[in-house]
């Protein structure tokens, strides 16, 4: 299960950006150049490592 990547500041869906990083294997610096909103660029630069942490696995309910 993959959750949508959403900017917490502006609410923009960043799933297309995640697709470019993961599937098209573009560099993070190249992808950041195409983003116009500074808050989205900051989120990607600080919370995503390329090819890692791009999918979020849901926690298992142990109850």
From Swiss-Prot:
Alphabetical UniProt keywords: DNA-directed RNA polymerase, Early protein, Nucleotidyltransferase, Transcription, Transferase, Virion
Name of this protein: DNA-directed RNA polymerase 7 kDa subunit
Role of this protein: Part of the DNA-dependent RNA polymerase which catalyzes the transcription of viral DNA into RNA using the four ribonucleoside triphosphates as substrates. Responsible for the transcription of early, intermediate and late genes. DNA-dependent RNA polymerase associates with the early transcription factor (ETF) thereby allowing the early genes transcription. Late transcription, and probably also intermediate transcription, require newly synthesized RNA polymerase.
Reaction(s) the record says it catalyses: RNA(n) + a ribonucleoside 5'-triphosphate = RNA(n+1) + diphosphate
Taxonomic source organism: Molluscum contagiosum virus subtype 1
GO cellular component entries: DNA-directed RNA polymerase complex; virion component
One BP annotation, GO: DNA-templated transcription
Pfam families (alphabetical): Chordopox_RPO7
Superkingdom: Viruses
Known partners and oligomeric status: The DNA-dependent RNA polymerase used for intermediate and late genes expression consists of eight subunits 147 kDa, 133 kDa, 35 kDa, 30 kDa, 22 kDa, 19 kDa, 18 kDa and 7 kDa totalling more than 500 kDa in mass. The same holoenzyme, with the addition of the transcription-specificity factor RAP94, is used for early gene expression.
Primary gene name: RPO7
Upper lineage: Viruses, Varidnaviria, Bamfordvirae, Nucleocytoviricota, Pokkesviricetes
Compartment list: Virion
EC number: 2.7.7.6
